[in-house]
Amino acid sequence: FTLVTNAGEKEVLYSFTAVKETVDTSLGKADNLFHFTNLVQVNKEEAVSLYRSDKFKKIFLQGDDVLNNLYDVLYDRENVYESMEEFLIAIKKKSALTFSVDNNIRDYNIDGANEKDSIIIEKNGWGYIKLDVQCEAPFIKMKRGIITSDDFIGDVYELDYIIDDKLLHGGNNYAYIIISSYSHQEVIEITINGKEIVNDSG
C-alpha cells in the first residue's frame, strides 16, 4: 500500500497470512470433518462434547448452508449420540451400523417348568446404535427393553428371556420378539408347545 506522510509518499510492501482456526483434541489439532470422524471412533464422549459446542459449526461446518441446516435439524434430538451418528451417516463419513441375530425361528416344548433362552445379537460396523426390544406375548419375559452400544461386549450382546410356563395354554403358543434400530429390524418368531391340561374331575 502507499504510505502518505509530510515527507512524501512511500510504497510499503506487505502480506497477510490467514491462519485457519482449529480446536485441540486428544488426537491433536482438528479443523475438518475427517478429523472429527476420527475422534468419534476413538473417544465418543469427547466427540459428543465438541459436537454440542459452539465451536463445531464455526470450525467444522465453515458456513456451509447444507451442513448447517442438517446440523440444526438433528441438534434437538433427545439422544445426542443418535444425532451425531445420523449426522455422520448423512454426510457420508460413515455407514449405518447394522445388526443381526443368531436365529429368527425358535420352537420349544414346555412341560411344567419355565425355560430360559437368549438371542445373540451381533452389530456390524462402528458407531452408536440403540435397539428397542418389544414382545407383546405375556408369557415371554424380556430382560431388557432397550440396548445401546455400551451394552455390547465387542460386537456381541446376549439378550436373555424367560418363557413363563404358568402363562401358557395347552397346544401351540405364538410370540414375536421384535428388535429395531432406526434403520433395521429383526423379528424372532417363537412357537411354544404347551402342556395339555387334563381334566380328571369326571
Report residues per predicted region:
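A short beta-strand micro-motif common to beta-rich folds, especially ectodomain repeats
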Residues: 1-7, 119, 159-165, 169-183
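Surface-exposed binding patches on compact interaction domains or structured appendages
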Residues: 2, 54-60, 78, 95-98, ...
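Extended low-complexity, intrinsically disordered segments associated with secretion/export
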Residues: 7, 103-105, 138, 144
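Edge beta-strands of extracellular beta-sandwich domains
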Residues: 10-18, 185-193
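Short, hydrophobic/aromatic beta-strand segments
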Residues: 12-14, 127-135, 172-174
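Beta-sheet-dominated interaction scaffolds and their linkers
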Residues: 17-18, 23-124, 166, 199-202
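Terminal accessory carbohydrate-recognition/targeting modules of carbohydrate-active enzymes
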Residues: 68-71, 77, 149-155, 166-167, ...
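Internal, hydrophobic cores of structured domains that mediate oligomerization or house catalytic pockets
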Residues: 161, 188-201
